[in-house]
Amino acid sequence: MTEIKISKTEKKLRHYITKAIADYKLIEKGDKVMLCLSGGKDSFGLLKVLHGLIEDKTYDIDLHVYTLDQSQPGWDDSQLRKYLDNLGVSYEIETKNTYGVVIDKVPEGKTYCSLCSRLRRGNIYRYAKEHKMDKIILGHHRDDLIESLLMSILYQGQIKSMPPKFITQDGENTVIRPMVLVQERDLIEFAKEENFPIIPCNLCGSQENLKRKKVKKLIQDLAHENPKVPSNILNSLSNVLPSHLMDRDLLNIIQN
């Protein structure tokens, strides 16, 4: 059997993805999993790596790819379909006009991301339940977690981010994020190497003053002065000292 050569970048991605899966017990043998492929570099990178890990028998799972066509102007998934066909994975591209809902409900000048993501998430959860998926796989990476933590603190007054694994409020779906240790720059490099047929999000990309972009710039500026800043922020998510916070419920538990 001929050994398939993989790049240094893919090896690095494999290392951090398998580490996260092991550390947080994200995948079990025989799981029926649904990978959400948005058409962006992150989910493409995760799909390529996870498919390779299944092919070389690292994981014994049933992988299904789900893409939601939100009826945005200019959406063209022909190359995405070709890529998935060539990869040989089970997939479905489902069309729902969430774009029309967003345009109708969001006032001019406001960002679409919040409502758009809620509608997308609702369709993902529905599809997963209808098809009895054990896990929903999302492509959020280390930088997403870091930015989300700061956004929650700065704009919502909450300390929260994106956990590696969580169960939805109704208890029906388990969501996992195998790339919580992966840096975005490695996914950018991998996308260049693999030449993924990326579908840009014109809806969000046209809105320049998004909060996430501001936070990303803030982190980059801080990292320029101290390169350890991003990893320190990430490490803070697993190094919580409740006794040094102001949550009265937590303090009552600790003190009693």
Swiss-Prot record:
SUPFAM superfamilies reported for this sequence: Adenine nucleotide alpha hydrolases-like (SSF52402)
The EC number(s) this enzyme carries: 2.8.1.-
GO process terms (BP): tRNA thio-modification
Primary location class: cytoplasm
Keyword set, alphabetical order: 4Fe-4S, ATP-binding, Cytoplasm, Iron, Iron-sulfur, Magnesium, Metal-binding, Nucleotide-binding, RNA-binding, Transferase, tRNA processing, tRNA-binding
Role according to the record: Catalyzes the ATP-dependent 2-thiolation of cytidine in position 32 of tRNA, to form 2-thiocytidine (s(2)C32). The sulfur atoms are provided by the cysteine/cysteine desulfurase (IscS) system.
NCBIfam families: PRK10696.1
Note: The thiolation reaction likely consists of two steps: a first activation step by ATP to form an adenylated intermediate of the target base of tRNA, and a second nucleophilic substitution step of the sulfur (S) atom supplied by the hydrosulfide attached to the Fe-S cluster.
Descriptive protein name: tRNA-cytidine(32) 2-sulfurtransferase 1
Organism field: Francisella philomiragia subsp. philomiragia (strain ATCC 25017 / CCUG 19701 / FSC 153 / O#319-036)
